Curated annotation (Swiss-Prot):
<keyword id="KW-0963">Cytoplasm</keyword>
<keyword id="KW-0547">Nucleotide-binding</keyword>
<dbReference type="InterPro" id="IPR004524">
    <property type="entry name" value="Asp-tRNA-ligase_1"/>
</dbReference>
<comment type="subunit">
    <text>Homodimer.</text>
</comment>
<dbReference type="GO" id="GO:0005737">
    <property type="term" value="C:cytoplasm"/>
</dbReference>
<keyword id="KW-0436">Ligase</keyword>
<dbReference type="InterPro" id="IPR006195">
    <property type="entry name" value="aa-tRNA-synth_II"/>
</dbReference>
<protein>
    <recommendedName>
        <fullName>Aspartate--tRNA(Asp/Asn) ligase</fullName>
        <ecNumber>6.1.1.23</ecNumber>
    </recommendedName>
</protein>
<feature type="site" description="Important for tRNA non-discrimination">
    <location>
        <position position="30"/>
    </location>
</feature>
<dbReference type="GO" id="GO:0003676">
    <property type="term" value="F:nucleic acid binding"/>
</dbReference>
<dbReference type="Pfam" id="PF00152">
    <property type="entry name" value="tRNA-synt_2"/>
</dbReference>
<comment type="function">
    <text>Aspartyl-tRNA synthetase with relaxed tRNA specificity since it is able to aspartylate not only its cognate tRNA(Asp) but also tRNA(Asn). Reaction proceeds in two steps: L-aspartate is first activated by ATP to form Asp-AMP and then transferred to the acceptor end of tRNA(Asp/Asn).</text>
</comment>
<dbReference type="InterPro" id="IPR047090">
    <property type="entry name" value="AspRS_core"/>
</dbReference>
<keyword id="KW-0648">Protein biosynthesis</keyword>
<feature type="binding site">
    <location>
        <position position="173"/>
    </location>
    <ligand>
        <name>L-aspartate</name>
    </ligand>
</feature>
<keyword id="KW-0030">Aminoacyl-tRNA synthetase</keyword>
<dbReference type="InterPro" id="IPR029351">
    <property type="entry name" value="GAD_dom"/>
</dbReference>
């Protein structure tokens, strides 16, 4: 129906007759000449109709925004006075000789431009219209380029694209499963995969030593700006490669994406132990563009006559830390109060601070309500340790280690954003040497990543002291966002059983849930490992979108619903009967009396 896209017509097409198909972006009538800006996925071109062709001119006079047209005409150069430097096609126009209205359109519920501020609920309800906007078109085109580049890179590195099942069984991976009732097996359910984890490990046992898949995954969890109930994962697994080799291959992939699609050289991906990331930056995914660090001062505060500091300093599970903000002395008190409220989200009971007006005057040069509680020798040691200068601001955290780490880690990111402290545009790194387990409130252990991650110790050492064991896991972080995570997997049956035992999974439960995996590990499972990248999150970062909902064609809302199709929806009684499901009426809970 067409010979060329609207957005690619240029001066090389001058004097050629072309046929275009697209949507009316704008229509203007200027002194008897009708101008139509015709839009398709590649951009916009101006089409001109004049009264000399009366029938086509009359038809052009009827078109309105978002009508679908087929236009034939001759490309001609614009006059110097009418060249539009803001359009890619602004040096030419198409003189229309034929016009066909393929479909009319009602007035859209919102303007399809980049300047109209439309609520996200409206955009999602009319997503098929929202996707016509240039920003959305560009993001989805970019996404297609990324997936194509990923496939090419992995194909060139001898990886095989192998699909794994969508209907599988529930396995403990940290979030709730989406369950699918079985019609043919009464009372039993499939689960939609949270990841292809076990199947890709089984592919390694099968001898497919380099696997990848751009896989749909599903998690029934609370949603945030970077979460969706269904999401896309770049899933990778290899045999006979250690951590450094896996990190090298995947680092090369991400570097190539940025180089070829963004024109950005990411440079070196430094390695940082998990313990250092948490101690200095308060996060296992630190944003290394921000030049702020948390400094331990527990030893300085253990004996001061200020319980807010000395209490946590004397507590083995407490932490007292300080963070210097260069030039932060100019932050007004009102903003400090706002930061105090901000850290309370993470359990902090307050936010102590010192403004350094004159570091040589410990009595009059330090501005803070807490200075009077701290001896001068402690203040001097504090200033020396932090290497402060006049005009700096020091924030303090004193509480349980968990609260201090999370609160000041979040404050560090907030300060970086508010004060524009970023020292570079992109800061990648690998976080390594993660703990194997983390302790829950009841004292039990849970896997920090998942129970198939290999520890960096023997089964005997793991059994003797599981709480201190490190894993062979690694996360790729970019600008404070976890792009992907992975690990070397357990390929020895006895080690896998020991990890299950540490996690409180008895032999009977092991056989019930993971019998197929334990059996596979008996038949010559090779050393293997891999990782997975969140494709949606990667595209969000690369395009600068504020949410992954802006890089997915048809996303769900933050309540895991589709307002366009009204999903999830009710099903008829017959379908429920076939699935052996009976719905109980929802009983309203009585309100508590105040």
């Amino acid at each position: 129906m067409r010979s060329v896209y609207c957005g690619v017509v240029n001066t090389s097409n001058i004097d050629q007759e072309i046929t275009l198909c697209g949507w009316v972006d704008r229509r203007r009538d200027h002194g008897g000449v009708i101008f139509i800006d015709l839009r398709d996925r590649e951009g916009i071109v101006q089409v001109v109709f004049d009264p000399d062709a009366a029938d086509k001119f009359a038809l052009a006079d009827k078109v309105r925004p978002e009508y679908v047209l087929r236009v034939t005409g001759k490309v001609r150069a614009r006059s110097e006075a009418t060249v539009n430097a803001n359009m890619a096609t602004g040096q030419i126009e198409v003189y229309g000789t034929d016009l066909e209205i393929l479909n009319s359109a009602e007035t859209p519920p919102f303007q399809l431009d980049e300047h109209t501020n439309v609520g996200e609920d409206v955009r999602l309800k009319y997503r098929y219209l929202d996707l016509r906007r240039d920003a959305m078109q560009q993001r989805l085109k970019f996404r297609s380029k990324v997936t194509n580049a990923i496939r090419n890179y992995l194909d060139d590195n001898d990886f095989l694209d192998i699909e794994t099942p969508i209907l599988t069984r529930a396995t403990p991976e940290g979030a709730r499963d989406y369950l699918v009732p079985s019609r043919t097996h009464d009372g039993k359910f499939f689960a939609l995969p949270q990841s292809p984890q076990l199947f890709k490990q089984l592919l390694m046992v099968s001898g497919f030593d380099r696997y990848y898949q751009i896989a749909k995954c599903f998690r029934d969890e609370d949603l945030r700006a970077d979460r969706q109930p269904e999401f896309t994962q770049i899933d990778i697994e290899t045999s006979f490669m250690d951590e450094e080799q896996i990190m090298s291959v995947t680092e090369g992939m991400i570097s190539k994406l940025f180089r070829e699609l963004k024109g950005v050289e990411l440079g070196e991906f430094p390695r940082m132990p998990y313990a250092e990331a948490m101690e200095k930056y308060g996060s296992d995914k630190p944003d290394m563009r921000i030049p702020l660090e948390m400094v331990e001062i527990k030893d300085l505060m253990a004996s001061v006559d200020f319980k807010v500091f000395s209490g946590p300093a004397s507590d083995p599970k407490g932490r007292v830390t300080a963070m210097k903000v260069p030039g932060g002395g100019e932050i007004p008190r009102k903003k400090i109060d706002a930061y105090t409220k901000f850290v309370s989200i993470y359990g902090a009971k307050g936010l102590a601070y010192i403004k350094v007006n004159d570091k040589t005057d410990l009595e009059g040069g330090l501005q803070s309500p807490i200075v009077k509680f701290l001896p001068q020798d402690v203040l001097q040691a504090l200033l020396d340790r932090l290497e402060v200068e006049n005009g700096d601001l020091i924030f303090f955290g004193a509480d349980s280690a968990k609260v201090v780490t999370e609160a000041l880690g979040a404050l560090r990111c907030e300060l970086g954003k508010d004060l524009n402290l970023y020292t570079c545009e992109w800061a990648p790194l690998w976080v390594v040497d993660f703990p194997m387990f983390e302790e829950l409130e009841d004292g039990s252990l849970t896997a920090l990543h998942h129970p198939f991650t290999a520890p960096s110790c023997s089964p005997e050492e793991l059994s003797a002291n599981p709480a201190t064991a490190l894993s062979r896991a690694y996360d790729m972080v970019l600008n404070g966002t976890e792009l992907g995570g992975g690990s070397i997997r357990i390929h020895d049956q006895s080690m896998q059983q020991e990890v299950f035992r540490v996690l409180g999974i008895g032999e009977e439960e092991q056989r019930e849930k993971f019998g197929f995996l334990l059996d596979a590990l008996k038949y010559g499972a090779p050393p293997h490992g891999g990782l997975a990248f969140g494709l949606d999150r990667l595209i969000m970062l690369m395009t600068g979108a504020s949410s992954i909902r802006d890089v997915i064609a048809f996303p769900k809302t933050q309540s895991a619903a589709c307002v366009m199709t009204d999903a999830p929806g009710a099903v008829d009684k017959k379908q429920l009967e076939e699935l052996h499901i009976r719905l109980r009426p929802v009983v309203a809970q009585p309100k508590e009396q105040g």
